Amino acid sequence: MITDPIADMLARIKNAQAARKSEVYIPHSKIKEKIAQILKKEGYIEDYTISEENKKGNQGTLIIKIKYLDNRNTKPAISGLRRVSKPGLRKYVGADEIPYVRKGLGIAILSTNKGILTDAEARKEKVGGEVLCYVW
């Protein structure tokens, strides 16, 4: 059993990029789907789909198409991923304490009472929450 599914998702994306894969298969959950939606909207991945094939129990598969900046799959769009809030040590921030990732060149993904948001959206909505991860 995976104790931290979000860290597992980020590690799978990082490993797929290192191996120059075009897509990665991740067990589906609603929070992972929202994170994939944000990554697509921000331009870090090409696309994502949910497959009901190879279904284990009630869980489908989230298929993420990795985005590369060149034709040879050598320069991934995501140069770094970091899990911030972990099951053993949660990291919460207020609306005025939301961090800037790489001086504004990256994004922070937060879990707020208004759903999963990027740092810019959370600042605009003036809500704080749990910092899930940084992407740059």
Curated annotation (Swiss-Prot):
It comes from the Bacteria. GO terms for cellular component: ribonucleoprotein complex; ribosome. InterPro entries: Ribosomal_uS8, Ribosomal_uS8_CS, Ribosomal_uS8_sf. GO terms for molecular function: rRNA binding; structural constituent of ribosome. Keywords: Ribonucleoprotein, Ribosomal protein, RNA-binding, rRNA-binding. One of its GO terms (biological process) is translation. Transmembrane segments: none annotated. PANTHER family: 40S RIBOSOMAL PROTEIN S15A. One of the primary rRNA binding proteins, it binds directly to 16S rRNA central domain where it helps coordinate assembly of the platform of the 30S subunit. Belongs to the universal ribosomal protein uS8 family. Part of the 30S ribosomal subunit. Contacts proteins S5 and S12. HAMAP family: Ribosomal_uS8_B. This is Small ribosomal subunit protein uS8. The lineage of its organism: Bacteria, Pseudomonadati, Aquificota, Aquificia, Aquificales.
